[in-house]
UniProtKB/Swiss-Prot annotation:
(6S)-5-formyl-5,6,7,8-tetrahydrofolate binds at residues 23, 80, 123, 450. Homodimer. Heterotetramer of two MnmE and two MnmG subunits. Exhibits a very high intrinsic GTPase hydrolysis rate. Involved in the addition of a carboxymethylaminomethyl (cmnm) group at the wobble position (U34) of certain tRNAs, forming tRNA-cmnm(5)s(2)U34. This is tRNA modification GTPase MnmE. Keywords: Cytoplasm, GTP-binding, Hydrolase, Magnesium, Metal-binding, Nucleotide-binding, Potassium, tRNA processing. Belongs to the TRAFAC class TrmE-Era-EngA-EngB-Septin-like GTPase superfamily. TrmE GTPase family. Binds 1 potassium ion per subunit. It is found in: Cytoplasm. Mg(2+) binds at residues 233, 254. Residues 219-372 form the TrmE-type G domain. Its EC number is 3.6.-.-. GO terms for biological process: tRNA methylation; tRNA wobble uridine modification.
Length: 450
């Protein structure tokens, strides 16, 4: 598969729509445009033309726009045909393009190949390319704004600034090592240690913001757990604002998980209603309970729901003992509307009524708090787990470098090496030094046509 052969794909989502787009990218597409339309196209102008089959039959009418390299999304020549959004029409237009460009090497594009070419042609860095996919996948306005901030290059600029400062600091270390006869301590002369402290501080700030970006992009896996009939399904419905789960007075109604995505202040939360936890001889219910524990094991946050009208028993104690210690647990006492007196709850617990709506706003805010979301923070860009991991790796190397900076000149070579490793971790975010395997993994997750 040649990276330089022209490629084509339907760029709009599958299904019917008012407009559909066929996108082509590659070298010298002026020749292909001449074959398709029998005339040259003026770059960056919209031409209203018939789209014809090889025998002259009119398939559709629409706009043809030619972008000459390097002034295009991919950095190559790009030809976009905008017609009506019917699947059959778009398939015929694409087939005609592939037929007309067969001897030019035109082939169907692979997922993400247009954006990969934009990256390889330095129209986007890797973090910006990922932001394209995140913008398409954004499930809330906050996530869309964050993706657009990343696409604009703000996150990349912050990373590049840190990288440049690390390079400058490394130059001072190398100069001290390479010119010992000068008897000049470049680290002292150019205040390298305060520079390293400032670098570490700014990197820590960036890590905190990246955590916000990861939460905004990926959300949290929140599991509702507890005995049967404590109101888990009612709480899911209340948070979702819809009747998602079946609610009955019969214990054991929920036998398999029910997942619903909700948004609180733009943050996506994947709420999982599960089978009630109890001892049972019912084979089907037992399978549901086993699945509940699997969901609990992979949860980011557990809401342990309890019925405030019922005293705790041995089963409650068993559940508490089995909950994973590494996962935050919020004890939620439901059905407070059925109490005659005010409820005296435990510290760090919440009292609610899922059906009556009591305490739900407080619960939503507690969920954000436990997620680590800071609503007063600077409007974040979206980040991925790999970005956060790379930033944390860079911070670890700077921490080790700081230790070496406190020693004598005999460890300056180690100081320089830790700075090199920190720089390498950061440049992996923007793709300056990134393996082909990682690139393949990232771009394969894109939709075809993007």
């Amino acid at each position: 598969m040649s990276l330089y052969a022209p490629i084509a794909a339907i760029a709009t989502a599958p299904g019917r729509g008012g407009i559909g787009v066929v996108r082509i990218s590659g070298p010298d597409l002026a020749e292909l445009a001449q074959r398709l339309f029998g005339r040259p196209l003026t770059p960056r102008h919209a031409h209203y033309l018939p789209f014809r089959a090889a025998d002259g039959e009119v398939i559709d009418e629409g706009l043809a726009i030619y972008f000459r390299a390097p002034h295009s999304y991919t950095g190559e020549d790009v030809l976009e045909l905008q017609g009506h959004g019917g699947p059959a029409v778009l398939r015929r237009i694409l087939a005609r393009c592939l037929q007309a460009g067969h001897d030019l090497g035109l082939r169907p594009a692979e997922p993400g190949e247009f954006t990969r070419r934009a990256f390889l042609n330095e129209r986007l860095d890797l973090a910006q390319a990922e932001a394209v996919a995140d913008l398409i996948d954004a499930s809330s306005e906050a996530a869309a704004r964050g993706a657009m901030t990343s696409l604009s290059g703000e996150f990349s600029q912050r990373v590049n600034d840190l990288s440049d400062r690390i390079i400058h600091l490394r130059m001072l270390v190398e100069a001290t090592l390479d010119f010992p006869e000068e008897e000049i301590d470049f680290l002292e002369k150019y205040q390298a240690r305060p520079t390293l402290q400032a670098l570490t501080h700014d990197l820590d700030t960036l890590i905190a913001q990246a955590r916000q970006g990861v939460i905004l992009r990926e959300g949290l896996h929140v599991v509702l757990a507890g005995k049967p009939n404590v109101g888990k399904s009612s709480l899911l419905n209340a948070l979702a604002g819809d009747d998602i789960a079946i609610v009955t007075p019969i214990a054991g109604t929920t036998r398999d998980k029910v997942v619903q995505e909700i948004h609180i202040d733009g943050v996506p939360l994947h709420i999982v209603d599960t089978a009630g936890l109890r001892d049972t001889d019912d084979a089907v219910e037992s399978i549901g309970i086993e699945r509940t524990w699997k969901e609990i094991e992979r949860a980011d946050l557990i809401l342990h729901l309890q019925d405030v009208t019922q005293p705790p028993d041995h089963l409650d104690a068993q559940i508490v003992r089995r909950l994973p210690a590494r996962t935050p647990v919020l004890n939620v006492f439901n059905k407070v509307d059925l109490l005659d007196a005010a409820f005296q709850g435990q510290p760090d617990s919440l009292a609610i009524s899922a059906r009556g709506g009591i305490g739900l706003d407080a619960l939503r805010q507690r969920l954000l708090q436990l997620a680590g979301w800071n609503p007063g923070a600077e409007s974040p860009w979206l980040a991925r787990e790999r970005h956060l991991h790379a930033l944390q790796q860079a911070a670890q190397h700077l921490e080790i470098a700081t230790e070496h900076a406190r020693e004598d000149d005999r460890v300056l070579d180690l100081f320089a090496e830790e700075l090199r490793l920190a720089h390498e971790a950061l440049t992996g975010i923007t793709g300056k030094f990134t393996s082909d395997d990682l690139l393949g993994e990232i771009f394969s997750s894109f939709c075809i046509g993007k």
